[in-house]
């Protein structure tokens, strides 16, 4: 009976302790209503763990005492008060010293690190961190790949640019060579020489021009000798009568005659039966500044033309009689000298017959 009574009392005390735990958990839930979520669930699990621990401790105490009643029971006092005090002392560890509910921070610190809830939360945090790390590593790899692609494209562009610059330089050289070949009068720079050339070579045009100048000079000298200019103006070069000079005169005689015929200078040669006075007068009138030597025969032709006109005028004057004053003061009418009171006839009647003269033929 005693054991049955004690078991009944223990069962009743366990029920009361369970009610107290539920009340305490309700109070804790009301006090921590603001902290919802994972913190509130941890507090509830903490309170339940301690309530189950207190119930297990009471059962262990009953088994250790062998089901004996407390001293208060032997004295006739109800054992309920003593058991209530013991259970209250076990529950005070959950409550705050002031009698209020335990704070969320203390509950979190008292929870074991090896509890299933904390382990699950830690595993979730680590998984999220690993996922974030993997995402960032993938983004970093993509950025590195993009940078490598850009560098490769830059190298390709640089190679293309170098090739285009080389082609442009070659095109410029081709254009320069084409222009040089198209313009034969292009003069090279003094310092510019073709690679592989043995030395400075004269141009074909320069040789041709020098040859023509020399030939023209020789012809001019021959003409001057034929016209007698070197006799009027002696010089050391013309005074020296050497066999070479004679040979040159003989060689270039035909050439000078041919050129004189082309220029129309054959008319200026006096007839073989010309008097000495005519030649002397011609020499006196031809004395003057030496014609300028040029590469062409224009100056020589002009000088010879003036000399021919002067000789024609001399021949015309020579045809008059010095004693006839009327002929000098006559008036030209119709291309002839008219008769004057002191004249004894026409000029044509007193002129010597010069029909065989070339000068007279040109004059008429």
UniProtKB/Swiss-Prot annotation:
Its main location: cytoplasm. GO terms for cellular component: cytoplasm. Residues 24-33 have a biased composition (Polar residues). Residues 290-305 have a biased composition (Basic and acidic residues). Residues 139-181 form a coiled coil. Residues 1-81, 94-121, 263-305, 324-352 are annotated as: Disordered. It holds the Pfam family TDA11. It comes from the Eukaryota. Keywords: Coiled coil, Cytoplasm. It is found in: Cytoplasm. Belongs to the TDA11 family. This is Topoisomerase I damage affected protein 11. It comes from Eremothecium gossypii (strain ATCC 10895 / CBS 109.51 / FGSC 9923 / NRRL Y-1056) (Yeast). The lineage of its organism: Eukaryota, Fungi, Dikarya, Ascomycota, Saccharomycotina.
């Amino acid at each position: 009976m005693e054991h049955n009574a004690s078991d009944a009392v223990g069962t009743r005390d366990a029920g009361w302790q369970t009610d107290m735990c539920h009340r305490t958990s309700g109070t804790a839930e009301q006090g921590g209503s603001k902290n919802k979520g994972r913190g509130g669930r941890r507090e509830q699990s903490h309170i339940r763990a301690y309530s189950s621990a207190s119930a297990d401790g009471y059962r262990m105490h009953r088994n250790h005492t062998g089901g004996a009643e407390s001293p208060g029971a032997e004295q006739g006092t109800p054992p309920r008060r003593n058991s209530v005090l013991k259970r209250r002392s076990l529950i005070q560890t959950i409550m705050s010293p002031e009698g209020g509910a335990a704070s969320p921070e203390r509950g979190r610190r008292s929870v074991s690190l090896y509890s299933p809830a904390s382990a699950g939360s830690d595993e979730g945090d680590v998984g999220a961190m690993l996922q974030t790390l993997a995402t960032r590593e993938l983004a970093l790899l993509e950025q590195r790949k993009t940078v490598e692609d850009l560098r490769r494209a830059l190298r390709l562009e640089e190679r293309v640019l170098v090739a285009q610059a080389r082609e442009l330089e070659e095109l410029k050289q081709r254009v320069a060579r084409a222009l040089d070949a198209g313009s034969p009068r292009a003069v090279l720079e003094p310092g510019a020489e073709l690679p592989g050339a043995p030395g400075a070579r004269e141009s074909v045009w320069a040789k041709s021009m020098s040859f023509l100048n020399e030939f023209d000079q020789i012809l001019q000298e021959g003409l001057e000798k034929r016209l007698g200019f070197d006799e009027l103006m002696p010089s050391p070069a013309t005074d020296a009568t050497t066999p070479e000079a004679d040979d040159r005169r003989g060689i270039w005689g035909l050439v000078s005659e041919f050129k004189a015929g082309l220029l129309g200078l054959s008319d200026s040669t006096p007839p073989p039966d010309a008097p000495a006075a005519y030649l002397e007068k011609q020499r006196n009138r031809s004395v003057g500044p030496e014609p300028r030597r040029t590469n062409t025969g224009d100056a020589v032709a002009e000088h010879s033309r003036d000399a021919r006109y002067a000789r024609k005028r001399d021949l015309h004057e020579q045809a008059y009689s010095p004693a006839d004053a009327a002929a000098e003061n006559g008036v030209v009418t119709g291309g002839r000298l008219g008769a004057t009171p002191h004249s004894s006839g026409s000029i044509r009647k007193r002129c010597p017959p010069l029909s065989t003269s070339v000068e007279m033929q040109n004059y008429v």
